[in-house]
Design a protein with these regions (language model features):
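Acidic-basic catalytic patches of nuclease active cores, encompassing PD-(D/E)XK
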Residues: 1-39
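Catalytic cores of nucleic-acid endonucleases
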Residues: 7, 65-118
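Short, solvent-exposed loop/turn elements at beta->coil junctions and helix N-caps
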Residues: 39-42, 111
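Protein kinase-like catalytic core scaffold
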Residues: 46, 57-59, 109-111
Length: 137
């Protein structure tokens, strides 16, 4: 019974640190001039951590928190997660067209914010989701 309690507490702490990383990412994006449209937006296909807009660009953000600096291969979503994220962003974007004013051109972008235990941010911009039209730069 003691082990289950320890595992529960460890998981709960990881969840709280992840939420804190999302909140700090939100503040960072606001300071950069992004308008936050949604936070932890749920869809039938999964959840997107942050959805922001600046000008004609809509930014979808996945926030990762790790205690240690991870390799990029550990940060990038797995193929199954990429498919889920792509379907979720497509679902959200199709609904955003009804909420946002029409524009001649909308640019979609997907970024990953990777936070480590010491508060270091590594931002991956324009991350490609395989089997999609988005590309890693």
């Amino acid at each position: 019974m003691k082990r289950a309690t320890y595992t529960y507490r460890k998981r709960r702490l990881a969840d709280q640190l992840g939420r804190l990383a999302e909140f700090i990412s939100l503040l960072y994006l606001r300071a950069q001039g992004w308008r936050i449209l949604f936070r932890r937006k749920k869809t039938p296909f999964g959840e997107i951590d942050l959805i922001c807009r600046r000008g004609n660009t809509i930014l979808f953000v996945e926030v990762k928190y790790r205690r240690k600096q991870s390799e990029i291969s550990q940060i990038l979503p797995s193929p199954a997660s990429q498919n889920r994220l792509y379907r979720a962003t497509h679902y959200i974007f199709s609904n955003l067209q009804h909420l946002e004013p029409a524009s001649d051109m909308i640019c979609l972008r997907f970024d990953i914010f990777s936070w480590t235990g010491f508060g270091r941010l590594k931002r991956y911009r324009n991350v490609a989701l395989e089997n999609t039209s988005w590309h890693f730069e």
